[in-house]
Amino acid sequence: MLQNPELHYLDNAATTMVAPEVADVIDKAMREHWANPSSLYGPGARSEEALNTARAAVARTLGCKSRELYFTSCGSESNNLALLGAVRTRTFGKGIVVSGFEHPSVQRPLEELAKQGYDVTVVKPRPDGTLDMDRMLEHVDKNTILVACMMVNNEVGTRNDVERLAAEVKRRNSRTIVHVDAVQAWMRVPIKLDNIDTLSVSGHKIHAPKGIGALYLSDRLVQAFRPPYLGGEQERGLRPGTENLPYAMGLAAAATRLAKTMKSRDTAMRALNQRLREGLKAFPEVEINSPENAVPEVLNFSENCIKSETMLAWLAEAQIYVSSASACGRGQPSHTLATMGKDPLAIDTAIRVSFCGDNTPEDVDAFLDRFEDGMKHLQRIRK
């Protein structure tokens, strides 16, 4: 996909490049499906048909009904829509339980709900970055209206067993809503929606463009669901505003494309991850932050010597692009590493490498070579 062989893009947890075939679908849709899907005349009817086809394609990759799939602008909007709308369907309590390493688009709405009188309990992860499920379940009782947990952490790649969590939550209180942020999980790990009520995904993490996402909203909730904003009747009245049909079609194309290669990509990602881990063993200062159960697409480590921004600039000079934390927390220390109990030096020197199916062993080797030079050169300057 890369046109420049000298460029090594290893920040795919932040965003992915739009696949050429996805861009082609969008370009064609912009030329052929320009009419408003809500219009009653011929071109509008054809746009509506294309929208329904795209919805069905995305729904198939999630294993849900088409009517349970709502297009949004991004994963962050999906999270906000799910959380702020779902709590308004429950009047029997005020309890909310959430994991301590959520994306800001989950953290901030829940902080706002806490100001409104909801009892929000944040459960820290274990020191290795894994979900402390027992502690989360301890807080679920008859007054718990919502439990939220991301499926794959965006900073360290932790894979959380949200299916088991959802089942245990429902066993304790069948009326508790379970929300899952699956933005980093979709098309990386299998998703089973049993006992999950709402789930968010995003296009730009799977080689679709920025500006398109989706929300799964279970039939169990839809009748009582009260969206936080109002307007037109698009998306069955839950998400007002004329639908972005070309991007919805692009999202469907991207999801369909990746659904065919999940197993082979997983094997390739594991090989790249292991190659990087082996290479990092040459540096005694390096501490791996990603837990053993992390998805292979993400490897987070601290080199405990050079500040992240300095090392990132050094790597970028050679067109090697990685990150230090979540792109959504630009300029901020890693929230996830802090909740894991990492010390300030580890947080200040953390680097996240994240792969996609277009990456190669040469990308890893280029990173390791430049990283080694940086460790030598930058430490000399510091001294």
List where the protein language model places each region.
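Pyridoxal 5′-phosphate
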Residues: M1-K383
